C-alpha cells in the first residue's frame, strides 16, 4: 500500500529538534482527518497516540491498539493535515521482541502513512531498539515516566518520580534514549522537579504531559482539553466544554424530530415549477 502524499510544508524532525531551549513546541493528539484539520494550523506536531484505543474505541487501556489500527488512523490524520509533523505511536507488542521486528513494523508505519516519525514507550532496555531504528533512518521519539503501555506493571496510572529509585531510573532512561538517537522524549506523569532536571540535562527536546511547564513543549489528548469528558487527569486544562455543547445539540435535535419541527421548510426540497 502506498503512503499518503506528505506536504513539503510540514515541520521536519530537524526543525523540531532545533527547538530545544527555544520557543515551546505545541502538540496535540488527533485520530482522524476531521480533528487533524482543526489541530494542524496551530500544532508543531500531531501525535497519533495509541490513546485512540481508549478515546475512539472505548477500550480500558492502550494495550488493545493494533498496528493496523495505528496505520489506519495515521493515514486519516495525514490526509487531514499539511503543516504539522505527524508522529505515530508504535503499539504494544510491535517493537519489544527484537530490533528487527521493531524495524519491520516501523517501516510499515512510515511507508503506509507517510508520517514523520514513530514513538516508543519504555525505558533504557529499549535503547538498543531505538539505536537500531535510528541507524536505519527511522526517526524515533521516546516516551518515559508514566508509560500507559506498562500500566499493568506500574499497577495503574500512577505519577512517577516520587522515590529516589524512580527518579534515578527515569533520568537514566532519558540519557539512554538520547544516546541511542531519539530526537525527542515525552515525559508523562512525572514530578515537576524531575521533569525540570531532565530537561536541563539532555540535549533533545522534552515534551511534557503532566510534567512541567519548563519542558521544551507540551502535548495533550485533544478530547481531554476540549472538555469531551467530565473526568480528566489533574494535568489537563479544559480549554472548552464541548461535551456539554454536544449533549445540548443532540437533545435539541431529538426534541425537534419528536415534535416535527425538523426538518423545517428550509431543510426540504419542493418540486421545481
Swiss-Prot record:
GO terms under biological process: pantothenate biosynthetic process
Enzyme active site: 188 (proton acceptor)
InterPro entries assigned to the protein according to its UniProt record, in alphabetical order: Pantoate_hydroxy_MeTrfase (IPR003700), Pyrv/PenolPyrv_kinase-like_dom (IPR015813), Pyrv_kinase-like_dom_sf (IPR040442)
Compartments, record wording: Cytoplasm
One Gene Ontology term of the molecular function aspect: magnesium ion binding
Cofactor detail note: Binds 1 Mg(2+) ion per subunit.
Pfam family, one: Pantoate_transf
Binding site residues for Mg(2+): 50, 89, 121
Cofactor: Mg(2+)
Catalytic activity: 3-methyl-2-oxobutanoate + (6R)-5,10-methylene-5,6,7,8-tetrahydrofolate + H2O = 2-dehydropantoate + (6S)-5,6,7,8-tetrahydrofolate
Record keywords, A-Z: Cytoplasm, Magnesium, Metal-binding, Pantothenate biosynthesis, Transferase
A GO CC term assigned to this protein in UniProt: cytoplasm
NCBIfam families: panB (TIGR00222), PRK00311.1 (NF001452)
Family statement drawn from the similarity comment of this UniProt entry: Belongs to the PanB family.
Protein role: Catalyzes the reversible reaction in which hydroxymethyl group from 5,10-methylenetetrahydrofolate is transferred onto alpha-ketoisovalerate to form ketopantoate.
HAMAP family named in the record: PanB
SUBUNIT field: Homodecamer; pentamer of dimers.
Name listed for the protein in its UniProt record: 3-methyl-2-oxobutanoate hydroxymethyltransferase 2
